Amino acid sequence: MQEQYNPAEVEAQAQQYWEEHQSFNVIEDPGKEKFYCLAMFPYPSGKLHMGHVRNYTITDVIARYQRMQGKNVLHPMGWDAFGLPAENAALKHNTAPAKWTYSNTDHMRNQLKQLGFGFDWSRELTTCKPEYYQWEQWFFTRLYEKGLVYKKMSTVNWDPIDQTVLANEQVIDGRGWRSGALVERKEIPQWFIKITDYAEELLNDLDKLPNWPEQVKTMQRNWIGKSRGLEMRFDLQSPVGEFTSFDIYTTRPDTLMGVTYVSLAAEHPIAKYLADSNPALAQFIADCKVQSVAEADMATMEKKGMDTGIKALHPITGEPVAVWVANYVLMDYGSGAVMAVPAHDQRDYEFAQKYHLGITQVIAPQNGETIDLSQAAFTDKGVLVNSGEYDGLDFNAAFDAIASTLEMANKGRVKTNYRLRDWGVSRQRYWGAPIPMFNLPEGGEIPVPAHKLPILLPEEVVMNGVQSPIKADPEWKKDELDGQYVERETDTFDTFMESSWYYARYTCPNFTDGMINKAAADYWLPVDQYVGGIEHAILHLLYSRFFHKLMRDEGLVSGDEPFERLLCQGMVNAESFFIKSEGKENWIEPENVVIERDDKGRFIAAKHKITGDAVEFGGVIKMSKSKANGVDPESVINQYGADTVRLFTMFAAPPEQSLEWSDSGVEGASRFLRRLWKAVEGHINAGTPGKLDAASLPQQQKDLRRKTHETIQKVSDDYGRRQTFNTAIAAVMELLNETSKLSDRANPQGLAVEREALEAAILLLAPIVPHITQALWIELGNSGIPLNQPWPTLDESALVRSTIEVVVQVNGKLRGKIDAAVDAPKELLEQIAVQQENVQKFLEGVTVRKVIVVPNKLVNIVAN
């Protein structure tokens, strides 16, 4: 056996073996229990980062462990390849998005192989290829035929100079990222899928997911946002054009008697009508259109409004109330109109304070406390006051009474509402799957028939950064159907479409007769283990659940949910440093910083390695390009090997917690692997083991054997139930320490016990460090590779102890430890304990008052 561990050589050999034997390619096997393990597939940005490495290492470890459990494991990989970054990169590098994307997938595939991930590459998917997106196009036409797809006017970010639609991330401080023009909110026709038809099922089925993090389920519940409220009609005092009333939805009808004004969204039809004859209002509405509609921004921005001059009538009292247009009311929630109760809603309160509008208290705390409305709104539920016949009612009673009054007057009804909006899938970009609809010359549109699919996206294009090449090319739009001229839709799909069903296509990636091969899908689905970041908790995971239900209702898949168990891995963090210049933070790569630390390793001061300038500590934050604190996985692999990177990422923290990158931690992982190598080398050089005779072992060998099987027991639980791989690694490290203490290695029995311990350690570590364990397994003379071995089996008899360690205390403080026979009598334990030299030291000159003995655990001598 080679004396020194050479990671590059060991890893190349293992990877070559897996490639030649197609070790990870699988097919359906009805006679075998399946396990489908999946990591969220990456966007092919060009290079793997440490976040990718952590995600895919976790998934690979789980997949390999399940393989060793004897299961038929599907562990695929592919590329979420459409999207705006490819367009931006193509412009920057003067190339076509397709060429840039395919070049990146080639490079990243090699990086993934270099890390030893056991993917079934025969199932590789690339979502920008027609053989993938053609089925998405087909499915969209089916949804259209079922009435689940519709087109409506929708507001977008419009760049008036570039004459194009901008994604939210392309709007920087209200201006277009490229032109610098003030961005407008503009209405254009867009395609939507009716996710709201499935809102109730999406909400209820979260209860079918016991193995999902509660945090993710809560986020989805809040996003779906089911609420019970009252929809009511406010009549206008005088008609406004064709409008005689408008509807309002509220979840707090108990506050209705405190309404002092109502607010309309800038896009409300009544506001638009009034703006035609009111230039000041038209200007205010135009200003609203350039503001952000992101919830976080809406919450903190200044509340602004304009009195329209018209009045609405309170639905119960008939009193006239002012109608305002306000920038904090959104058209796409409820009805685009809200009743304003400044005393009991903070946004309404701030607005009323600014514009000197009435504030009427109608809710009082249930405990009779007084409230100070000069400071803030009282937003809790309570008891009604100043509300006429409803005074004294609590929230529930008031809800029912007011609902009853309005229903009898035909002015309102109880309604369940959802915060969830229908999914807008149109994007006015080029690099996406074309939406399969034809526009007819006489108006209207029809779905592209199956025989004309796929609608191909041209890949050889020139990007000008302004308009989508397919929108700019009049020839691309032209098509014919049954001899009639039609025009293709030039919008493309939201890229969340591709990632909403890829998990199902992995079960049959080369199936040409349809979107999904149901037999294959029924064998493999649901995904048993899904791994990905919590940032995908809402959109991707909600859309995937929705798509699964759509595919189920089309007869393509079975079951209600796509992912059985979800693990959201934590972020990879690292130290960050910057130099402040002209109020701006210029981030510095850690390798260019000289750091002074205290004896506990904490930061004291730092300076730039080259310039000597003082450098500030930016904290331990998420690795990112913008903060210059990323670590290139390739450089670490080149220095230490892939197994070291894998071991460190699994050992540094439990998978769902943040991991702090540490060079010394990486060095420690490398050191452990070298120790493991040396332990096996030393064992081989010591001679040939005999056949293990467990019944006749001396005590030290029994102890090592017990440690081996305790480790198997613990590590099996850590891998399977707990998924705490860091503690599994720690347990194997302990086992290796115990193995190194074995003094009797000269006889075949001693070597047999050591062999059992080393082979167990190798198999237990094999999912985490697959290259070195494969090399060591073969060096020990075993046939096959660890991946194909059964998981180590626990020998319960080896756990039985003849002796046990008992702690000895004097007055509750640890003063010694003794080895005693299991279940030794109390008197014997007491006798042995007081004879310990260190214990006697603490008993000099004192009187023993009593001795407390806990069998098999502890002796505590109480003395004074």
From Swiss-Prot:
GO terms for biological process: leucyl-tRNA aminoacylation. GO terms for cellular component: cytosol. It comes from Cellvibrio japonicus (strain Ueda107) (Pseudomonas fluorescens subsp. cellulosa). It catalyses: tRNA(Leu) + L-leucine + ATP = L-leucyl-tRNA(Leu) + AMP + diphosphate. It is found in: Cytoplasm. This is Leucine--tRNA ligase. Belongs to the class-I aminoacyl-tRNA synthetase family. It comes from the Bacteria. NCBIfam families: leuS_bact (TIGR00396). A motif ('KMSKS' region) lies at residues 622-626. InterPro entries: aa-tRNA-synth_I_CS, aa-tRNA-synth_Ia, Leu-tRNA-ligase, Leu_tRNA-synth_edit, M/V/L/I-tRNA-synth_anticd-bd, Methionyl/Leucyl_tRNA_Synth, Rossmann-like_a/b/a_fold, tRNAsynth_Ia_anticodon-bd. Keywords: Aminoacyl-tRNA synthetase, ATP-binding, Cytoplasm, Ligase, Nucleotide-binding, Protein biosynthesis. GO terms for molecular function: aminoacyl-tRNA deacylase activity; ATP binding; leucine-tRNA ligase activity. It is an enzyme of class 6 (ligase). The keyword Transcription does not apply. SUPFAM superfamilies: Anticodon-binding domain of a subclass of class I aminoacyl-tRNA synthetases, Nucleotidylyl transferase, ValRS/IleRS/LeuRS editing domain. The lineage of its organism: Bacteria, Pseudomonadati, Pseudomonadota, Gammaproteobacteria, Cellvibrionales. It holds the Pfam family Anticodon_1. A motif ('HIGH' region) lies at residues 42-52. ATP binds at residue 625.
